[in-house]
Swiss-Prot record:
PANTHER family: TRNA(ILE)-LYSIDINE SYNTHASE-RELATED. This is tRNA(Ile)-lysidine synthase. The lineage of its organism: Bacteria, Bacillati, Actinomycetota, Actinomycetes, Mycobacteriales. InterPro entries: Rossmann-like_a/b/a_fold (IPR014729), TilS/TtcA_N (IPR011063), tRNA_Ile_lys_synt (IPR012094), tRNA_Ile_lys_synt_N (IPR012795), tRNA_Ile_lys_synt_subst-bd (IPR015262). GO terms for biological process: tRNA modification. Ligates lysine onto the cytidine present at position 34 of the AUA codon-specific tRNA(Ile) that contains the anticodon CAU, in an ATP-dependent manner. Cytidine is converted to lysidine, thus changing the amino acid specificity of the tRNA from methionine to isoleucine. The gene is tilS. Gene3D superfamilies: HUPs. The keyword Magnesium does not apply. The keyword rRNA processing does not apply. GO terms for cellular component: cytoplasm. The N-terminal region contains the highly conserved SGGXDS motif, predicted to be a P-loop motif involved in ATP binding. GO terms for molecular function: ATP binding; tRNA(Ile)-lysidine synthase activity.
Length: 314
């Protein structure tokens, strides 16, 4: 008798799908919520988790940013149900314009948080490599964690060790018809340009596939950041009532993370420019004035050095 997930018959030989099934096994729970766009990555993830006998609720978000988005979202939900998953369709509004990608991501995660406290997403090793390069262009090369936390939502990324070729190949093996987002072919989006132009060029220069090395660098950046963040968390009480200038002697990376934590604890948005100027109040103190960090009802918020501490005044 053929193996089934829902009404979908599984092929006897499916090497790409097997890679995904192996990838999800360390993360499995009885019931998993998965963000499903209908694209090959998330569709293959839903199938892999179902094949491993977990229950799945697919959450399909319609961002209302493209013509026909409602049809795409409902088709994704229908494919999930065909495989035996439950599916929820939720419509959200995202303001178009500059920064639309980030705004859509924030709105999507906010919608997930209304429906569950943990969401699985289908980022692959290829996404990890692209994220690392994009971060490097902003001066902050970093990677994605396989498990990360937002205030009201845990995010699980079980496919960071799998390739995009595996998810696309699995859809072919299973006879699934994923949606292909037209924006993924538009090099006006920086991530797409990285994918379609930069990584192929790196492959030529490198003489081989650059993705595993970039993904490894991203993972190491994540691991290093976790060490520093752990130290910051343990020492947070030290700057509960102002940031002591005695911390100027800490290693640069740790000190700047501590400063950023101090500022965020006071509700201040952190930028590299602000952090550089505030750090100089510690490491290059010449009696300079305060650093503007925002506004309050009484005027301008500043970080100033007084009585052996950095403090926020207005």
């Amino acid at each position: 008798m053929a193996s089934l997930i829902g009404n979908l018959e599984l092929p006897r030989v499916s090497p790409n799908f097997l890679e995904l099934r192996k990838a999800v096994r360390p993360y499995l729970k009885e019931h998993v919520h998965i963000g499903l766009s209908g694209g090959p990555d998330s569709l293959a993830l839903v199938a892999a988790v179902l094949a491993e006998k977990s229950q799945v609720t697919a959450i399909c978000i319609d961002h209302n940013l493209q013509t026909g988005s409602a049809e795409v979202t409902h088709n994704a939900a229908a494919m999930a149900r065909h495989m035996g998953a439950q599916a929820i369709v939720k419509s959200i509004e995202v303001a178009p314009g500059e920064g639309m990608e980030a705004a859509a991501r924030e709105a999507r995660y906010a919608a997930f948080a209304q429906l569950t406290d943990e969401i699985w997403v289908a980022h692959t090793m290829d996404d990890q490599a692209e994220t690392y390069l994009l971060g490097g262009l902003r001066g902050n090369p970093a990677g994605m964690k396989d498990a990360s936390r937002r205030p009201e939502l845990s995010i699980i990324r079980p496919l960071l060790g799998a390739r995009r070729a595996h998810t696309h190949g699995a859809c072919v093996e299973l006879g699934l018809k994923p949606w292909h987002d037209p924006q993924n072919f538009d090099d006006a989006f920086r991530r797409v340009a990285i994918r379609n132009q930069v990584i192929p060029l790196l492959a030529q220069v490198h003489g081989g596939d650059p993705v595993p090395g970039l993904a490894l660098a991203a993972r190491r950046a994540v691991e290093d950041a976790e060490v520093v963040e752990g130290d910051v968390e343990k020492r947070r009480l030290e700057w509960q009532d102002g940031f002591p200038v005695t911390l100027a002697g800490e290693p640069t990376g740790l000190r700047r993370r501590m400063l950023a934590d101090f500022l965020r604890g006071e509700g201040i948005a952190v930028t590299s420019r602000k952090l550089d100027a505030i750090d100089r109040l510690l490491t290059d103190w010449r009696g300079q004035g305060g650093v503007a960090v925002g506004k309050s009802d009484n005027g301008r918020l500043e970080v100033v050095r007084q009585s052996g501490k950095l403090k926020i005044t207005d």
